[in-house]
Amino acid sequence: MKIRMYNVGFGDCYCLRDRKKSLLVDFGTNNSRIEGRPRREIFDLIISDLSTIECKNLLLTHFHMDHLSGLLYMMKNKDSSFDFGKIYLPDVFSEEKMSRTLVLLLLADLVKDSCLPSRQVSLFALIDALLERQTQTVELLSRGKIFEEKYQALWPDTDVTQRETDEVYNLLREKFPEIMDVLF
């Protein structure tokens, strides 16, 4: 197996390759420039590198821009020949106890002033791009699930996520009780 780490400044992007296929883990940055170059140039280099790989999939570890901005750029600016065979996303959607988390993620995205653990969230942007480009296969990963026949999802830990969500929810309920009554 070969591991290729891409310099994306503040963000994550690396590729795990074996003889059969590759898995890009995250694809984003918060930087507008990386080593003096516009980030779109860095994204284009990564996309060009990936275009030589026939079977490629993507794992997004979570929904922050420093992990998915390159994917959004690619989906907006490149034709479908650059698409991934499969995109793996953390499953924060299926379990009922995660419904508050989903509402807070979407709310944070709407107001662009995230109260969630000090990160910018862009779930709307991702969902919009995936719906617009319906050639992508998406698989939701819950903690412990094996994917690609050799990797195991370690997140989301729904207990930890629920605890963090409850903290944010309680803080928002304290500050904005009328709004929270409408939302929940």
Which residues does each predicted region cover?
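Flexible, acidic/histidine-containing loops and adjacent segments that form or flank the divalent-metal
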Residues: M1, Y73-F184
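Short linear motifs at secondary-structure transitions and domain/linker junctions
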Residues: M1-K2, S32-R37, T61-M65, L126-L130, ...
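Conserved beta-strand hairpin/beta-sheet module of binuclear metal-dependent hydrolase folds
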Residues: M1-S51
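Active-site environment of divalent metal-dependent phosphoester hydrolases
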Residues: F10-D12, N31-S32, F63-S69, S94-K97, ...
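Generic recognition of cysteine residues
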Residues: C13-C15, C55, C115
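Active-site-proximal beta-strand/loop segments in catalytic clefts of secreted hydrolases
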Residues: F27-G28, T61-F63, P156
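Active-site metal-binding motif and surrounding structural segment of the metallo-beta-lactamase
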Residues: G36-L89
